[in-house]
UniProtKB/Swiss-Prot annotation:
Localization terms from the record: Secreted
Keywords annotated in UniProt: Glycoprotein, Secreted, Signal
Name under which the protein is recorded: NXPE family member 4
Matching InterPro entries: Ig-like_fold, Ig_E-set, NXPE4_C, NXPH/NXPE
Residues carrying a glycan: N91, N159, N223
Annotated gene: Nxpe4
Family listed: Belongs to the NXPE family.
Species whose genome carries this gene: Mus musculus
Length: 543
C-alpha cells in the first residue's frame, strides 16, 4: 500500500511539474527563457516609441496585402446588404404600427415540422408602401408555458416586402413575433456612423514606474503630435497607442480603463430613430397565436450526433423546456467531468466566454482555482483537477477591452499569438469568442482581428490537426444600451462577418446569436440556462 501511495504521489508531482512548465510557456515564454538562460525573443507586443504615425517595418513576417484584400471583400459583401437609404423625416421611415404581416396559407391547425411563412409589407408612418428594404427585423416563435422558443428566418426582397419563415418544431399554442429593431433609414445611419471614427470610447492608461503613477490617453488610433508609445503586434500589424508620459518607459503601462466619449456621428434627426420607443417595436397584431398539432405519427428520423465541421441550419435549433435542441444534429447526454478528463481547455475572449469558466467551476466541484497573482475583474483564470488531469483557463482577448473598472494589461496579447504558442494535440481544446468589445469601432477592426485569428488557427491545425477548435459567436444584448455604440445591429454584422471568415475551417460553431434570439434574451451576459445549453453543445463536440 505504501508503494502504491508513493507511486501515486510521484505521478501527481510529475503532473504538477509538467503542467507548471506547460502553463508557464503558454502564459509567459519570456519568463521561462530567462529562468533557464535561453535566448529571449519578444514575440508578443513590441514596444516602440515614435511619432503619431510610426513607420511600418520594412520586413514584415507576412505581407499584409492578402489580409487587406480579404477585409475589403468581407466589407463589400456587408455593404451590399446595407445600402444607403435616404432620411428626410421620421414620417417617411418604416413604421411597425403601419406595416402589415400576413400569414400565407393560414389554417386552423398547422403541423409539427411544417414551415410557416409570413409576408411583411413595410409602410412608413403615413401609411405609404416602402419601395426599398434594409429594415433590421428579429423574428421569434415561442410558447411560454412550454419554455420553448425559436428564431425565424427573414428574407429581404429589397422592395419593401419581406418573407419571414418559421419551422414549427413543437406542438401546442405558439405565439409569433416580428420586431422592427431599426428601420432601414436607421440601419443606414448606424452603418455610416460606425465607419467614421475610433473616438467613441476613451481609454486611460496607468503607467507605474517605481513610486510614480501617471495616467495618459490611449487609443487604437491617436492623432497627436506628442510622443507616443506604440504597442505593436508585429506579425499581424495590429497596434494600440498611448501618449508617452515624461521620463517613464513605455513598458511601464500596467493598468487600463475606459469610458464613453460624448461624441456622435448621427444628426439630431437621426438620433430620434433610436429612442427606446422606436426600438424593437412589434409588427404582428395582438392575435398572433397559432395552433400546432402532431399530424404525422411516423417516428422522426434519427439525426447524427453533433460534431465539428457541421453546417448549421437556419434556424440552428430551438429551445424546449429551457434546453437547446439543434435542428441538424442530436445532442447525446454527456457527463461533464468524464468528458473533461485529461483535457487542456483554453477559453479565449470576452466575458461571455468567461461565463463558461464560472459554470465549469460551479458544476465540477473537484476543480480548484489557481491563484495567478493578478487583480481586477479581467484577470486570467485557471482551474485544475490534478487527479483527473483537467486544466481550464480563461484569458481575455487583446485591445480593445471596454470597461469602467480598472484592469491589468501586463499580460495582454492578441489571441493569434496565444494560438501560435500552443502545441496542440487531441486533448487540447481551444474556444474563442469575439465581438462585444468591438461594436463601438469601425468593423474593419473586427474583421482584421477575426482574419488574424483564422490564420493562426490554420497554422495550428496544419501542425496539429487533432486539436479541437470551437467558435462561440456573440450574443444579443440589452435593447436600452447606447445604440450608436452597442446596437445589436453592429453585433449582427459582426456575426455575419465571422461566419463568412471561418466557414472553411473544420471547427465547431456554437451559434450563440441564434440561441439568444430563440430564448428571447436581451442580456449581454445570458442566464445559466443559456450557458448550460452552449456548454452541452461544446461537450458533444469534444467527446
Amino acid at each position: 500500500m505504501k508503494t502504491l501511495a508513493s507511486r501515486k504521489s510521484l505521478w501527481m508531482l510529475l503532473f504538477i511539474v509538467i503542467f507548471w512548465v506547460s502553463f508557464t510557456v503558454f502564459r509567459n515564454p519570456v519568463k521561462l527563457r530567462t529562468m533557464f538562460k535561453l535566448p529571449v525573443s519578444f514575440n508578443r507586443w513590441n514596444l516602440v516609441m515614435g511619432p503619431s504615425c510610426p513607420a511600418v517595418p520594412l520586413n514584415l513576417p507576412v505581407s499584409p496585402k492578402e489580409t487587406e484584400l480579404r477585409i475589403r471583400e468581407v466589407l463589400e459583401k456587408l455593404d451590399k446588404q446595407i445600402p444607403p437609404r435616404p432620411f428626410t423625416h421620421l414620417n417617411y421611415t418604416t413604421s411597425a404600427t403601419h406595416s402589415t404581416a400576413t400569414i400565407l396559407n393560414p389554417r386552423d391547425t398547422h403541423c409539427v415540422g411544417d414551415q410557416l411563412d409570413i409576408l411583411v409589407e413595410a409602410r412608413d408612418h403615413l401609411g405609404n408602401r416602402k419601395g426599398y428594404g434594409g429594415d433590421f427585423m428579429r423574428a421569434r416563435m415561442f410558447s411560454p408555458a412550454l419554455k420553448a422558443g425559436a428564431s425565424g428566418k427573414v428574407t429581404d426582397f429589397n422592395n419593401g416586402t419581406y418573407l419571414v419563415s418559421f419551422t414549427l418544431f413543437w406542438e401546442g399554442t405558439v405565439s409569433l413575433s416580428i420586431l422592427l429593431m431599426h428601420p432601414s433609414e436607421g440601419v443606414s445611419a448606424l452603418w455610416r456612423s460606425r465607419k467614421q471614427g475610433y473616438d467613441r470610447i476613451i481609454f486611460s492608461g496607468q503607467f507605474v514606474s517605481g513610486a510614480s503613477q501617471v495616467h495618459t490617453e490611449c487609443a487604437l488610433v491617436l492623432n497627436s503630435s506628442v510622443e507616443l508609445c506604440q504597442y505593436l503586434d508585429a506579425q499581424d500589424q495590429e497596434a494600440f497607442y498611448c501618449v508617452k508620459p515624461p521620463n517613464v518607459p513605455c513598458a511601464a503601462l500596467t493598468y487600463m480603463q475606459s469610458k464613453n466619449k460624448d461624441v456622435s456621428y448621427l444628426s439630431q434627426q437621426e438620433r430620434s430613430l433610436f429612442e427606446r420607443s422606436n426600438i424593437a417595436v412589434e409588427i404582428m397584431e395582438k392575435s398572433n397565436a397559432i395552433s400546432v398539432s402532431k399530424c404525422n405519427t411516423d417516428t422522426a428520423p434519427v439525426k447524427e450526433k453533433c460534431k465539428l465541421g457541421m453546417v448549421s441550419a437556419i434556424p440552428s435549433g430551438h429551445v424546449w423546456k429551457n434546453a437547446w435542441t439543434p435542428a441538424s444534429c442530436s445532442l447525446a447526454p454527456i457527463k461533464m467531468k468524464d468528458c473533461l478528463r485529461g483535457k487542456f481547455i483554453y477559453l479565449m475572449g470576452d466575458s461571455t466566454i468567461r461565463q463558461w469558466m464560472e459554470y465549469f467551476k460551479s458544476k465540477v466541484n473537484t476543480l480548484r482555482s489557481v491563484d495567478l497573482h493578478e487583480s481586477g475583474k479581467l484577470q486570467h483564470q485557471l482551474a485544475v483537477d490534478l487527479d483527473e488531469k483537467i486544466s481550464i483557463q480563461w484569458q481575455k482577448h487583446g485591445y480593445p477591452l471596454i470597461g469602467s473598472l480598472v484592469y491589468s494589461v501586463k499580460e495582454i496579447e492578441n489571441i493569434a499569438r496565444i494560438i501560435d504558442r500552443t502545441g496542440g494535440e487531441k486533448n487540447t481544446v481551444i474556444v474563442i469568442s469575439l465581438g462585444q468589445h468591438f461594436r463601438p469601432f469601425p468593423i474593419d477592426l473586427f474583421i482584421r482581428r477575426a482574419l488574424n485569428v483564422h490564420k493562426a488557427l490554420q497554422r495550428l491545425l496544419l501542425r496539429s490537426p487533432d486539436t479541437v477548435v470551437v467558435l462561440k459567436t456573440e450574443n444579443t444584448r440589452e435593447l436600452n444600451s447606447d445604440v450608436e455604440r452597442f446596437s445589436d445591429f453592429h453585433g449582427y454584422t459582426q456575426y455575419l462577418a465571422l461566419k463568412d471568415i471561418f466557414q472553411d475551417l473544420n471547427v465547431g460553431v456554437i451559434d450563440a446569436w441564434d440561441m439568444t434570439v430563440a430564448y428571447g434574451i436581451n442580456n449581454v451576459h445570458p442566464p445559466e440556462d443559456v450557458v448550460r445549453s452552449q456548454i452541452n453543445i461544446f461537450l458533444n463536440y469534444i467527446c
